């Protein structure tokens, strides 16, 4: 299993807009329906709604790599450009 922790730092006021646009566009549902996706969940920091944490779990690194290449992830990258200043990713194979 592959576990990813992705910390997004948004522009002021952008954290909630980022997650809302991903949800409203259907991207979140599309990712969760992908082969090998165990979970894909966004959380907000208690201190700042502009700090967003994404926890992803995948059956295998190969399935997560296929996810990155999907059309809806290209759309997510466009949304990310509007709202996100910095992204930090940590991966662990369990």
Predicted segment positions?
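Generic structural motif
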Residues: 11-13, 94
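Short, well-ordered beta-strand segments in beta-rich or mixed alpha/beta enzyme
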Residues: 2-9, 39-68
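Short amphipathic alpha-helical segments
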Residues: 14-37, 72-75
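Charged, amphipathic alpha-helical interaction segments
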Residues: 11, 69-72, 85
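Generic detector of short, locally flexible boundary/turn motifs and exposed helical patches
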Residues: 3-8, 16-22, 30, 54-57, ...
């Amino acid at each position: 299993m592959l576990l990813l922790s992705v910390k997004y730092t948004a522009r002021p006021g952008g954290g909630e807009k980022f997650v809302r646009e991903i949800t409203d566009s259907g991207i979140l549902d599309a990712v969760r329906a992908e082969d090998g996706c165990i979970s894909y969940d966004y959380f907000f920091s208690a201190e700042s709604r502009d700090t967003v944490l994404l926890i992803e779990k995948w059956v295998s690194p190969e399935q997560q790599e296929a996810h990155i290449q999907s059309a809806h992830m290209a759309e997510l990258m466009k949304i990310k450009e509007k709202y996100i200043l910095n992204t930090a990713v940590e991966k662990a194979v369990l």
